[in-house]
């Protein structure tokens, strides 16, 4: 066996290997012994046909094709060792020719990360003030959630809840036909057609109304675009929303912890502030990681992106499946996008995640941010604080190698982000240098 070609580009090595005739013959003998037990040959019991007869029966070309499974994996591994290549993942092997017996292998190599001067990274974290209007909006939402619905003896208004009979066609074909349909009259509603709610305003219970709506040419659902829906609607019942009175009693009923409406508003403010702070922190950290990646030299094998891409697509499919109402709807949505479309869509995200993971991982090892055993044990104690009688059982679970390993990764990521966050929040370098110059001038003037 000899390596006839070897190339290393970035994080991938490529080799071409030619097997000598002796190795091929030894391999063919092994292939013969494996296959002869499976193939029925006239005139011989299974497994007893001589090799020359067997080879004529199945053909030498077939034998050489089967030989690939018998000798290529081992030969590839030996060639990698002989060339002192350190693979990061399983090589991808392809046959070049079977006569002579030549194969090629693409071998992923470990990623390489050279960090930039990360101590110069600076970023600004947004501060968001919660306005009274924002709190008013949430309070209004809570009021509507606690509202009751009462029958109204009047024409339909926006915001009403209707019970109605609907008959309709779409370009003459049956469309939406319901005997008892509940419908919330909203100006922004687009179902069953854009502007449908507006046609219901001023209708009176018991009196039918007919109208038509043309779907816009650029409608999101192509099967509806440009078509005309003809409706006949009879309102059976009109209900109007009755909001509870907004006072201290309402706040206390909502949560016994609140004695006043002010306390409810304060809790809403705190919750909104927490969410906004979390968003600001996430945006801040995204800026930092992006800067770290941009200033660093990061090279990685394609297999890392492929693995991350597979995981992202799997997560998206699971999320999609959980949000649809039926398997048929799920299949219909899948039919609108090919695997290639999904790979193209999510590839940039996969590449960003790989680069981010490698850059932060390198930073963690450079600054020795991997937690020690004491830190991991302390975190486990926090996690099992509320476990009660099952503390020891929970502790044993967290100390299982795989679970403890994930916890170490989590703590490492947390410490690494805290480290780089602190750097990024320092004053801008220009300001620090300017201050140093001023101090130096002051000292000279004092002399």
Swiss-Prot record:
Leader sequence segment: none
Gene name tied to this protein: tig
Catalytic activity: [protein]-peptidylproline (omega=180) = [protein]-peptidylproline (omega=0)
Gene3D superfamilies in alphabetical order: 3.10.50.40, Trigger factor ribosome-binding domain (3.30.70.1050), Trigger factor, C-terminal domain (1.10.3120.10)
Entry's family note: Belongs to the FKBP-type PPIase family. Tig subfamily.
Domains (record comment): Consists of 3 domains; the N-terminus binds the ribosome, the middle domain has PPIase activity, while the C-terminus has intrinsic chaperone activity on its own.
GO cellular component term of the entry, any: cytoplasm
Domain PPIase FKBP-type: 159-244
Pfam families in UniProt: Trigger_C, Trigger_N
Function: Involved in protein export. Acts as a chaperone by maintaining the newly synthesized protein in an open conformation. Functions as a peptidyl-prolyl cis-trans isomerase.
Predominant place of localization: cytoplasm
Organism the protein comes from: Dehalococcoides mccartyi (strain ATCC BAA-2100 / JCM 16839 / KCTC 5957 / BAV1)
Annotated protein name in UniProt: Trigger factor
A GO biological process held by the record: protein unfolding
Keywords, in A-Z order: Cell cycle, Cell division, Chaperone, Cytoplasm, Isomerase, Rotamase
Localisation: Cytoplasm
Enzyme Commission number: 5.2.1.8
Enzyme class, UniProt record, top EC level: isomerase
Highest taxon, organism lineage: Bacteria
One GO MF term attached to the UniProt entry: protein folding chaperone
């Amino acid at each position: 066996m000899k390596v006839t070609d070897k190339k290393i580009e970035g994080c991938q090595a490529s080799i071409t290997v030619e097997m000598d005739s002796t190795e091929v013959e030894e391999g063919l003998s092994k292939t013969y012994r494996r296959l002869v037990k499976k193939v029925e040959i006239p005139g011989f019991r299974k497994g007893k046909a001589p090799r020359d007869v067997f080879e004529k029966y199945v053909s030498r070309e077939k034998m050489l094709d089967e030989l690939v499974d018998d000798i290529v994996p081992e030969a590839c591994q030996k060639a990698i060792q002989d060339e002192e290549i350190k693979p990061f993942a399983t090589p991808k092997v392809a046959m070049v020719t079977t006569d002579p017996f030549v194969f090629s292998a693409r071998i992923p190599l470990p990623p390489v990360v050279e960090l930039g001067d990360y101590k110069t990274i600076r970023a600004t974290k947004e501060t968001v003030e919660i306005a009274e209007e924002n709190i008013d909006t949430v309070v209004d939402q809570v009021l509507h959630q606690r509202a009751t619905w009462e029958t109204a003896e009047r024409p339909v208004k926006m915001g009403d809840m209707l019970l109605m009979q609907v008959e309709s066609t779409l370009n003459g074909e049956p469309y939406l036909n319901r005997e008892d349909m509940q419908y919330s009259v909203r100006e922004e509603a687009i179902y069953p057609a854009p502007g449908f709610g507006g046609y219901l305003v001023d209708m009176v219970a018991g009196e039918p109304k007919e109208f038509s709506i043309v779907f816009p040419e650029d409608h999101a659902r192509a099967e509806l675009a440009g078509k005309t829906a003809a409706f006949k609607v009879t309102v059976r019942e009109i209900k109007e929303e009755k909001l509870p009175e907004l006072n201290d009693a309402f706040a206390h009923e909502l949560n016994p912890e609140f004695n006043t409406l002010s306390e409810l508003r304060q809790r809403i403010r705190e919750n909104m502030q927490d969410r906004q702070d979390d968003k600001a922190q996430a945006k801040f950290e995204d800026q930092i990681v992006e800067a770290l990646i941009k200033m660093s030299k990061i090279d990685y094998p394609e297999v890392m992106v492929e693995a991350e891409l597979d995981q992202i697509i799997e997560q998206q499919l699971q999320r999609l499946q959980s949000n649809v109402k039926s398997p048929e709807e799920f299949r219909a949505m899948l039919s609108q996008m090919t695997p290639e479309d999904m790979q193209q869509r999510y590839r940039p995200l996969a590449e960003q995640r790989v680069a981010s993971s490698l850059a932060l991982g390198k930073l963690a090892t450079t600054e020795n941010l991997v937690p020690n055993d004491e830190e991991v044990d302390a975190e486990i104690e926090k996690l099992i604080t509320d476990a009660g009688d099952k503390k020891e059982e929970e502790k044993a679970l967290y100390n299982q190698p795989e679970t403890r390993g994930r916890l170490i990764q989590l703590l490492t990521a947390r410490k690494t982000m805290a480290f780089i966050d602190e750097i990024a929040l320092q004053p801008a370098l220009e300001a620090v240098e300017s201050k140093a110059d001023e101090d130096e001038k002051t000292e000279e003037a004092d002399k």
